[in-house]
């Protein structure tokens, strides 16, 4: 834990300048690139790590290594990048941290292990762990997080609930009628275009208002395309 050259930082209501060792015990960290000393087995490494904390149940090493199919007896230098990442995942949650900081955590994991990792995070979150998840794979953010911060050029451009971010963005809609008709558009409808009996338009506004309007119309079909988090992210960079 580095002491700031200027400014202040508080974690769990406590200044990092006061008893930083106490704060460290409450934090789990998973770096994007994992580097360990050679010569130890995965088991030795994890048991060594557990020794820095009180009341760590070492049975958790066994259960998590089974979950991630990690051979605890293999030497660190013999492990692939993906298996080193599995070891680091176990290390980050072994002491039941109150805050978990993850930097590009799924790099090196195959799809099966990624899914098991996501399930582990969901379990940890249900136990009360706050998780900070940094990733360029925005589908992961959308799946796992309830709030997102968008960072551009080292500064935070937005911090909002995921659902709020999605609702504030432009949606594309397509309505199909039995025939073209005169309509009174609700607020938020932009760029309406008729093509025979099909109306396409952009919509910016509450989804519930759009659904209410749809129910008042005699529609054959309707399609509403919600923007994904990647589209929203790119809007902040344009």
Model-assigned labels for residue ranges:
Residues 6, 58-78:
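Conserved ABC nucleotide-binding domain
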Residues 7-18, 22-23:
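Conserved ABC transporter NBD signature motif
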Residues 89:
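Hydrophobic anchor residue at the start of the ABC signature
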Residues 100-104, 109:
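Catalytic Walker B motif of ABC-type/P-loop ATPase nucleotide-binding domains
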Residues 117-203:
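ABC transporter nucleotide-binding domain
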Residues 202-238:
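C-terminal coupling/interaction segments
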């Amino acid at each position: 834990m580095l002491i700031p050259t200027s400014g202040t930082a508080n974690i769990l209501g406590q200044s990092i300048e006061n008893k930083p060792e106490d704060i460290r015990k409450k934090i789990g960290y998973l770096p994007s690139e994992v580097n360990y000393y050679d010569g130890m087995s995965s088991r030795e490494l994890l048991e060594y790590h557990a020794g820095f904390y009180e009341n760590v149940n070492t049975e958790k090493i066994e259960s998590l290594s089974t979950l991630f199919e990690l051979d605890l007896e293999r030497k660190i230098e013999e492990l692939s990048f993906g298996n080193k990442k599995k070891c680091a995942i176990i290390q980050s949650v072994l002491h039941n941290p109150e805050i978990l900081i993850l930097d590009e955590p799924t790099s090196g994991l195959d799809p099966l292990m990624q899914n098991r990792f996501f399930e582990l995070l969901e379990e940890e979150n249900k136990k009360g762990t706050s998780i900070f998840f940094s990733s360029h794979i925005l589908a992961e953010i959308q799946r796992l997080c309830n709030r997102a911060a968008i960072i551009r050029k080292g500064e935070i451009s937005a911090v909002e609930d995921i659902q709020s971010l999605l609702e504030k963005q432009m949606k594309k809609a397509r309505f199909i009628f039995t025939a073209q008709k005169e309509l009174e558009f609700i607020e938020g409808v932009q760029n309406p275009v008729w093509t025979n009996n099909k109306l396409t338009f952009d919509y910016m506004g509450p989804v519930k208002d759009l659904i209410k309007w749809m129910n008042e119309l005699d529609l054959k079909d309707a399609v509403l395309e919600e923007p994904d988090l990647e589209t929203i992210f790119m809007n902040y960079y344009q």
